[in-house]
Swiss-Prot record:
Keywords: Cell inner membrane, Cell membrane, Membrane, Transmembrane, Transmembrane helix, Transport. This is Multidrug resistance protein MdtL. Belongs to the major facilitator superfamily. DHA1 family. MdtL (TC 2.A.1.2.22) subfamily. HAMAP family: MFS_MdtL. Residues 25-41, 90-92, 152-157, 238-246, 292-294, 354-357 are periplasmic. The gene is mdtL. The chain crosses the membrane at residues 4-24, 42-62, 69-89, 93-113, 131-151, 158-178, 217-237, 247-267, 271-291, 295-315, 333-353, 358-378. It is found in: Cell inner membrane. One of its GO terms (cellular component) is plasma membrane. Residues 1-3, 63-68, 114-130, 179-216, 268-270, 316-332, 379-395 are cytoplasmic.
Length: 395
């Protein structure tokens, strides 16, 4: 079991590393590529577009050909794309490398969740996904620090050499440590009801959890996207103050994420999901009424706590009904989360909504819709019956 957890954690970490590792070198990259920093900021959107593109195909391929091949190919693509970025001499080549990086990271991301669905029951999976969320919160804090230390002695290309090395490590883990988990056959009692056709993505329970997780990701990405404006322009923080504040909010996320597995031993998953949405609603109201920086910071802290306590539980429930189509289910969740959050941020920008109102709107909207869905669409017997761990996996 440890090998599956190690490989899943490694596969997921490529995604945030690809976002945060290079940011510290952005000014130097802009100078060397004769591009403005604002032009290169599109690299974030290009990276997410690559992830969404990979998710369109990676899940189905993983269900048909296995988790291991997709993980290996994804790691290789990420490694090669990182090298391409390091060799870029102009902006378009750099953005092409970022798109390919997203493809590699997206394939690995999908496979990681499919592996956890293959190997863990719902109770253990919810705990592991909460821990995984806590670990991924470490990357946005550590990656800029590591990047800064690297750039003290080496050029910005070394940042992508480091990411390339991460791709190599993940590829080696996938090749030599990871075992195939794609179901070959299920226990005899499951054969009559567990088939790809029976595991439809169009069912009320999955759609409800897809909506909840998509709205939750929209909240956290809106917070990340709006944070520079809120903290530095509206609240008057310096870059140093901004970095410290974001590190502290990431620390809150880590503490809550690592505490959630213990909370699951005391409370029902539904209770934690309601607490999560209650924190979002409280954060939205707090931010709308805030007149001081202290109150605003308290509201931002509630956002991080709310996301950390509920996201892993909701993701675990969403994957629960799928024994044979875990890859496709994971892809669908990833695509909805990336595209849904991007759509909200884009629409808010087009409509000229301020950063604060953009955040307040998604907080209140997410909490109200999610609470209604939690009460109206609860796990039923058919979902519980589908919660099966593959009886036999490939060696």
């Amino acid at each position: 079991m440890k090998r599956f957890l190690l490989c899943s954690f490694a596969l997921v970490l490529l995604y945030p590393a690809g976002i945060d590792m290079y940011l510290v070198g952005l000014p130097r990259i802009a100078v060397d590529l004769n591009a403005s920093e604002s032009q290169l900021h599109i690299a974030f959107s290009v990276y997410l577009a690559g992830m969404a593109t990979a998710m369109l195909f990676a899940g189905k391929i993983a269900d048909q050909s296995g988790r291991k091949p997709v993980a290996i190919v994804g790691a290789i693509v990420f490694m090669m794309a990182s090298l391409l970025c390091s060799r870029a001499s102009e902006g378009s080549l750099f953005l092409s490398g970022r798109f390919l990086q997203g493809i590699g990271a997206g394939g690995c991301y999908v496979v990681a969740f499919a592996i956890l669905r293959d190997t863990l029951d719902e109770h253990r999976r919810a705990k592991v996904l909460s821990l995984l969320n806590g670990i991924t919160c470490i990357v946005p804090v550590l990656a800029p620090v590591v990047g800064h230390l690297i750039m003290l002695r080496f050029p910005w290309q070394s940042l992508f050499y480091t990411m390339s090395a991460m791709g190599i490590i993940v590829g080696l883990l996938s090749l030599f440590i990871l075992r195939e988990t794609r179901p070959v056959r299920l226990a005899p009692r499951d054969l009559s009801r567990s088939s790809p056709a029976a595991e439809s993505l169009i069912n009320r329970f999955f759609v409800s959890r897809l909506a909840i997780t998509t709205l939750s990701v929209s909240v956290i990405l809106t917070f990340v996207n709006a944070s520079p404006v809120l903290l530095m322009e509206v609240m008057g923080f310096s870059r140093g103050d901004y970095a410290i504040t974001m590190a502290l909010t990431a620390g809150v996320s880590m503490v809550v994420s690592f505490s959630t597995p213990f909370a699951l031993g005391l409370f029902k998953p539904r209770t934690l999901m309601l607490v999560s949405q209650g924190l979002f609603l409280t954060a939205g109201v707090t931010l709308s009424l805030a007149h001081t920086n202290t109150v605003t910071l308290f509201g931002l802290t509630l956002i991080c706590a709310g996301f950390s306590v509920g996201f892993g539980v909701a993701m675990s429930q969403a994957l629960g009904p799928f024994s044979l189509r875990a890859g496709v289910a994971s892809s669908t969740l990833g695509i909805a989360q990336v595209c849904g959050s991007s759509l909200w941020i884009w629409l808010a920008a087009i409509l000229g909504i301020s950063a604060m109102n953009m955040l307040i709107g998604i907080l209140i909207g997410c909490s109200i819709v999610s609470i209604l869905l939690i009460f109206s669409v609860a796990p039923n017997r058919s979902v519980a019956e589908h919660e099966e761990i593959p009886y036999q996996s490939r060696p």
